[in-house]
Amino acid sequence: MSDHDHDHEHTHDHDDGDGHDHDHDEDVERAAESEVRKRIALSQVRQYGDPVLRLRANEVVVFDAELARLVERMTALMHDAHGVGLAATQVGVVRRFFVFEHDGEDLVLANPTITRTGKDVEVDDEGCLSLGVVRVPVERPTEVVIEGKNAAGEDVKYELEGLTARAVQHELDHLDGVLIGDRTDPASRKEALAKLRPRLLLAPR
């Protein structure tokens, strides 16, 4: 799941002296480097039209060094791409786990199951690292309890709300081959498909 707001969180120090130009140049350089990392990261994320995004991922049965390396790679991609979550299928790995960020901590959840949802639901725009700039309104519960295993195969449970609750529901959808276009209203789906249609010409078969 993409984090649209992070793209706009650039602050600048203001100084009437020579320091202002130096600080401004550093900010511009950092922003440029961040954009390069984002483009490189997104080039490694499977995009709309790739058949792997429609597959239901297989349960994780082996928790080993290979899984740990995948988690590390996916976490780096998630941050570089300015995302708040990334599912294994989005990098072409048909295994049932995703990475996400919660309270400043990088986490992984394998074989996840939502065991409880709150009564309140909210419609909000969602983006996806596999769908470019497309954002569509999606209705989801605002609170969830989700259980699964960490990278070591240990049982874990998280009680989540707000953006993080939305993010884990989004990533769990990915593991079932479901995209945000499937969750939105017909008019928004039609508009999104019109934007995504050119990507189908470039998608692997």
Cite the ranges covered by each PLM segment.
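Positively charged
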Residues: 1-205
